[in-house]
């Protein structure tokens, strides 16, 4: 009788182990499916917004700023310094020298019509600075094709410039942003109008005057030729092939580009940078 009871107990224990293993496997499958659904959702959202490039500035070393969306990596020129006190995770510190900037090679995607450009900056007050430049590697510029051009006036407010059939368009902002604090700056071009957003609010707008002239120039982040450069930190720079709505822009400003730029972790299931980054105030 004892033998039969022992055998029965042993079988019961084995059955419990089998059930436990099965439950664990089911949990892993469900968790993997949830992660995959999140990743696919982020991919779909990113595709909807037309996110073409996202430079998150989390590389923490080296001479390359990775574009986690499409591989338009930026090359670090001069003496930029990696820091860990960005708006979201890491950042690059720019010393205000014209030879120190991030250079991204030309791609036709950057001639998109419409488009949106976004960036977090923490700039010190200085005499004339540059956020982004796209009109060649020399100064004076050989031709007026400022398809993407954002600079900081000597009085510390932002200025947008562009060209249509060689004619210049311009918006002068109202908000001081070179004040040692983090500010989110965005240019939204919908094919007819250009809007300047600072910290999620419209700071200036104007008709574009037509379709913006296109360029085959690289992107310079943090400087332009002729020794005009930024002094401060840059983080979360992104380029979209769509004109973002105000709500979409504010969501990106508040939550970062991470959720729109899923990446493949080495040897692991797809995850998103949104789960890995820390927001700094």
Task: Kindly label every feature range from the protein language model.
Residues 1-28:
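N-terminal secretory signal peptides that target proteins for export/translocation
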Residues 34-98, 250-281:
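Extracytoplasmic low-complexity segments
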Residues 48-52, 60-65, 97-159, 168, ...:
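Extracellular glycan-recognition modules
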Residues 93-94, 105-106, 163, 174, ...:
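Extracellular glycan-interaction patches encoded by glycine-rich segments
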């Amino acid at each position: 009788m004892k033998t039969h009871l022992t055998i029965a107990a042993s079988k019961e224990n084995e059955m419990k182990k089998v059930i436990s293993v099965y439950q664990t496997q089911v949990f892993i499958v469900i968790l993997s499916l949830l992660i995959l659904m999140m990743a696919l959702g982020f991919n779909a959202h990113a595709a909807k917004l037309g996110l073409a490039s996202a430079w998150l500035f989390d590389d923490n070393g080296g001479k390359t700023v990775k574009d986690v969306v499409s591989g338009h990596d930026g090359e670090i020129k001069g003496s930029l310094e990696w820091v860990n006190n960005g708006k979201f995770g890491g950042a690059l510190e720019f010393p205000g020298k014209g030879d120190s900037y991030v250079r991204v090679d030309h791609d036709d995607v950057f001639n998109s019509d419409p488009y949106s450009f976004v960036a977090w900056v923490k700039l010190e007050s200085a005499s004339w600075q540059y956020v982004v430049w796209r009109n060649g590697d020399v100064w004076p510029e050989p031709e007026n094709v400022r398809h993407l051009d954002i600079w900081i006036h000597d009085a510390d407010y932002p200025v947008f410039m562009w060209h249509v059939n060689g004619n210049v368009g311009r918006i002068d902002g109202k908000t001081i942003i070179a004040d040692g604090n983090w500010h989110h700056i965005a240019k939204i071009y919908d094919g007819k109008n250009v809007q300047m957003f600072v910290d999620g609010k419209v700071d200036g707008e104007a008709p574009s005057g037509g379709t913006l002239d296109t360029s085959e120039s690289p992107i310079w982040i943090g400087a332009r030729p002729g020794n005009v450069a930024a002094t401060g930190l840059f983080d979360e720079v992104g380029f979209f092939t769509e004109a973002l709505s105000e709500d979409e822009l504010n969501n990106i400003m508040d939550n970062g580009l991470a959720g729109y730029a899923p990446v493949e972790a080495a040897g692991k299931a797809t995850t998103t940078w949104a789960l890995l980054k820390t927001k700094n105030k």
